């Protein structure tokens, strides 16, 4: 689903109202960024019920910053975004599991907006939104927004037959993680965790992209050609891991079959 129109809150009624929200932040040697994102979470109009920082074997002050902010500190010694993120999701106790990166900067209404959408639209299982690059020239930010992120949402959205999850800015229902936690390639450090998670979602799981659910993100991934090439390699590796099961035509057929089942 894309965010052109408001979600229909009446399509399913079996899921209860949202009550608790956990925010998971994987962190590796990002103490300075971490301090900023934790301050942004402290300023939310609807505070998180739980903030979990996953220390991915950092050697800087990340752990100290997390404790000082009152976050729950979880240690994941296996290096990689996926191992750290998965450990955080496992530790989360909220009905909703939200995800930010250490260099994300959410606006004050980020949690409140996500909670409102997911409460009003019980059919939506995962809510995701875009990012705005904040630490680069305007032309780089525009390039990142329209080419890097725009390409991801459009091309991978066509591949999946629904919007992909953006790892720096999403919220999923707890039941979604419970369903896929044993399937994802959580031990790998050479894949995109958000793309891998998106590819493992069954046809019954609906992802909603809301263009107004924005967060600030760092331009560090796009600073060098080497960084861009590494992320392209991760994308290739992620798609290759899923083989025929993750082919576009199979995914589209599966989602169409599920849609027909819902209508019948």
What role is predicted for each listed range?
Residues 32-35, 60-68:
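Acidic helix N-cap motif at the loop->helix transition within catalytic regions
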Residues 39-48:
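Short, acidic, metal-binding catalytic loop of nucleotide-sugar glycosyltransferases
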Residues 76-92:
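Glycine-rich, basic loop-to-helix element that forms the pyrophosphate-binding segment
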Residues 129-134, 142-163:
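Short, flexible, basic/aromatic active-site loop/helix in glycosyltransferases
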């Amino acid at each position: 689903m894309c965010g052109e129109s408001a979600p229909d809150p009446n399509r399913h009624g079996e899921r209860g109202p949202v009550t608790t929200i956990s925010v998971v932040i994987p962190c590796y040697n990002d103490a300075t960024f971490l301090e900023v994102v934790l301050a942004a979470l402290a300023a939310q109009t609807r505070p998180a019920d739980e903030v979990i920082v996953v220390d991915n074997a950092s050697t800087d002050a990340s752990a100290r910053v997390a404790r000082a902010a009152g976050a729950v500190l979880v240690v994941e010694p296996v290096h990689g975004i996926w191992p750290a993120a998965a450990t955080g999701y496992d530790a989360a106790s909220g009905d909703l599991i939200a995800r930010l990166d250490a260099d994300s900067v959410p606006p004050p209404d980020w949690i409140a907006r996500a909670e409102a959408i997911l409460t009003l639209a019980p059919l939506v299982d995962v809510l995701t939104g875009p990012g705005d690059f904040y630490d680069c020239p305007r032309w780089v930010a525009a390039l990142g927004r329209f080419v890097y992120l725009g390409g991801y949402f459009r091309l991978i959205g066509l591949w999946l037959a629904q919007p992909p999850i953006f790892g720096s800015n999403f919220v999923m229902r707890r039941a979604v993680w419970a369903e896929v936690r044993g399937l994802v390639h959580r031990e790998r450090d050479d894949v995109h965790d958000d793309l891998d998670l998106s590819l493992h979602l069954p046809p019954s799981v609906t992802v909603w992209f809301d263009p107004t659910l924005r967060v600030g993100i760092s331009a560090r991934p796009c600073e060098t050609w080497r960084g861009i090439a590494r992320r392209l390699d991760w994308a290739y590796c992620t798609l290759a891991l899923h083989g025929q099961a993750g082919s576009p035509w199979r995914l589209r057929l599966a989602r169409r079959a599920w849609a027909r089942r819902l209508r019948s």
